[in-house]
Design a protein with these regions (language model features):
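A glycine-rich beta-to-alpha transition motif near the start of alpha/beta enzyme domains, typified by
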Residues: 1-149
Length: 149
């Protein structure tokens, strides 16, 4: 694959880490996403180390999240979760990751996708994998997510 330049944020959510991308920066054809995600994470890696990418060699460190404007009136953002296999060239979109779901509200606020004010934010997240709405409530510090750790 030819090297691409795609803006990304490497973000922690609970015990997981993920490469987080804006949907606007990815090809409209989702069939092209797998190749990009595999390259970004460093899969497949028969040795299970993912040294050529941002993955950490275990499933909790081999994730990609895509965030964009909501397609539903009852949500602020859409969030698509991708679990990238470590040793195989496979990307699974069938589930969700609760740990990374907790990071999508702060990501949306910090990236300016959701406007907030005050000391607390509530971001309504539409998980496109499960078609569920997740409410993320978190503290703010000067208009950004207040994050420790």
């Amino acid at each position: 694959m030819k090297q691409l330049r795609i803006p990304a944020v490497f973000m922690r959510g609970g015990t997981s880490n993920a490469v987080v991308l804006h949907e606007r920066d990815l090809p409209r054809d989702r069939a092209q996403w797998d190749e990009i995600f595999l390259a970004a994470i460093g899969s497949p890696d028969p040795y299970g180390r993912q040294l050529d990418g941002m993955g950490g060699g275990i499933s909790s460190l081999s994730k990609v999240c895509v965030v964009g404007p909501s397609t539903r009136p009852d949500a602020d953002i859409d969030y698509t979760f991708a679990q990238v296999q470590v040793k195989e060239a496979k990307v699974d979109y069938s589930g969700n990751c609760g740990n990374m779901s907790s990071a999508m509200g702060p990501f949306a606020v910090d990236e300016g996708l959701v406007k907030v004010s005050g000391k607390e934010a509530l971001v309504r997240i539409h998980n496109t994998n499960t078609r569920k709405i997740i409410h993320a409530r978190f503290a703010l510090d000067d208009g950004k997510a207040a994050v420790d750790g």
